[in-house]
Regions:
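Cytosolic regulatory modules rich in charged/polar residues
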Residues: 1-97
């Protein structure tokens, strides 16, 4: 299975899914100034977020998404856990008087 719900809003994804596929499944938008990442593989994209070879449990945040390396083999990312965090626009509601 390449996209597995783990509960608590977290999903384990294969590193060979594209960023666009994962963002679609998570109902997230890729920022307009970063559209070139849409066709990158998740593993390649995640690697670029680190300034070192990542280890399991290393994580980074990207525009409302927390990403954790969950499985590696010989410096290759195999699985990632994606956890969408609250989007700012979702917390604004209810102000109408």
């Amino acid at each position: 299975e390449s996209f597995v719900p783990l509960g608590g809003g977290r999903y384990e994804v294969d590193a060979d899914l594209t960023v666009g596929e994962v963002f679609d499944k998570l109902d997230l938008e890729i920022p307009d100034d970063d559209e070139n990442i849409e066709h990158k593989l998740m593993g390649e994209w995640a690697y670029e977020q680190f300034d070192h070879i990542p280890s399991e449990r290393d994580q980074f945040a990207y525009d409302g998404l927390e990403v954790t390396v969950s499985k590696m083999r010989q410096h290759r990312i195999l699985k990632l856990v994606c956890h969408p965090t609250a989007k700012p626009e979702e917390t604004k509601g209810g102000d109408e008087a």
